[in-house]
């Protein structure tokens, strides 16, 4: 074995790429390290293309092994199972920038597997995974227009920080990941605390500039370790067939794409395509129908893009910067804690908000450590939203990714646990879709949270921008349709407040997207965002003054931390009885904070009363109403508070001489007693006669 190793400094870490030792039967395998975080990236491609497919079959699998963090998996089977949400999101993060770098027409199946085998708790594995993937593809011989670089950018004390540690990210107002080639930015994923557009654009530029060291290092690594490039050539188009299809379908396609209603437009486009295909088959029964379908798709793209770039109205008749008609409703469902219906053109989201207690929070145990997520946002995309049938079940990668993007958009304005001690779950049901459903989810979430009485800092709106670029000419599109996303060159999603950006996601399919274009897109997005916020604020401009009557009300009290064990009781008996008998949910913190949750106010009051009794300190000189629980020769023991008993000595029962305690007291008798003393050992001395004397005096 002859290892080939390339190391370079990258920000505050050393990155090492190694090949030639592990997984040598794969087309390429790279062991990539950043500090002590190490991933094994393998690439395998099939040498024979599957021409029956009309798409590029690329699969990216990212898997975190618990042994990487020195842990044993939980659960019965004690082994890793289905991908977690974090693993799914990182797989998408890797997939998005590499997919455009494979050549058009390449249909060979390619699988990339990234396995995290060692993890430093201060260095997240996503950036080194992207770098390792780029290196593995570069040396594999598979046609790939890399290398690709990747960087994480933080913003701390008004300065950009390259690849910040986990601790640094905790104090950063920005968490941005950017990936690109030597010449172009291809992908951006970020979360921010309402930062200005120029700061966000500066972070993208900074990250792309800094990652050039990665691109150069991988190029050198490829020169030493790269395999010969596959002998692959792009399929040659039959120009006569291209011309014939244009003759048969261009006019009909142009007319169809002036129909504003999506489903009607799709029907007409289908008719035009079917007629053209039928005419071609009638003329030549041996024509390759798959190639015909591909060329019809290319013509469709050319028609739509040509109209936009020439200054003609968009598919639905809008100008480039126009937003579709908005309909905003809050409080649309009677029993949910909060709800909204947000409609933008033919995209619609029904969003609900549910409030719960701290125990309802999501507990996540990953290789980066344990964490608790109080705010959850789930996005569902049922097939009926686009007029189709399909499988319904567990969320797909796209649904997980869109939900996380909407979560990032809202996270900056969420209240702290001290401000609002609830767990919050938002669900966005996409009931109609024609572009930008994730940004509709952001708008709907903001409305539903306000309807639920969640004190978010301000409203948040989201907008999806697009781009059509031909040569030096380009048009930036606001509020793109699904077709404009599919047929355009850029998908640029921006969420934020009036003050700044909270989330930015960008996927670029071509090179040549300049800083000028991105700046125009950001400024145009700002105008669109403010317009949407104005409409949203007319429906509900601030959070409700109170939470729903159907939501649990959380009341917080403080007790002496030393009394926590008294509230819990032996084996949890006391707190179990409290929750069962009052119908409340009770949570205890080590610092003495007690949270009582119930939708019934009287039940909450009863629980508080009983907790206060349990934790109350016995006061010397105070008179208590107690119950006799034990009689002995020298006196009686009386319970004055839950778990608090005291002794009434025989001499303290009456002013008269008492010969037999049982002649004066009996079991379970209620008596008034005065606390005379609490000694150092906590023993309580009580007096009945002193209590009677005080009552007589009063």
Curated annotation (Swiss-Prot):
Enzyme class: transferase
Disulfide-bonded cysteines: none
GO (cellular component) term, any one: cytosol
Entry-linked PANTHER family: POLYRIBONUCLEOTIDE NUCLEOTIDYLTRANSFERASE, POLYRIBONUCLEOTIDE NUCLEOTIDYLTRANSFERASE 1, MITOCHONDRIAL
Gene: pnp
Domain S1 motif: 621-689
UniProt entry tagged with the keyword RNA-binding: yes
Name of the protein described by the UniProt record: Polyribonucleotide nucleotidyltransferase
GO BP terms in the entry: mRNA catabolic process; RNA processing
Catalytic activity reported: RNA(n+1) + phosphate = RNA(n) + a ribonucleoside 5'-diphosphate
SMART domains reported in the protein's UniProt record: KH (SM00322), S1 (SM00316)
Compartments, record wording: Cytoplasm
Function: Involved in mRNA degradation. Catalyzes the phosphorolysis of single-stranded polyribonucleotides processively in the 3'- to 5'-direction.
Residues reported in the UniProt entry to bind Mg(2+): 485, 491
Subunit structure, as described in the record: Component of the RNA degradosome, which is a multiprotein complex involved in RNA processing and mRNA degradation.
Cofactor(s) required, per the database record: Mg(2+)
Biological source species: Shewanella frigidimarina (strain NCIMB 400)
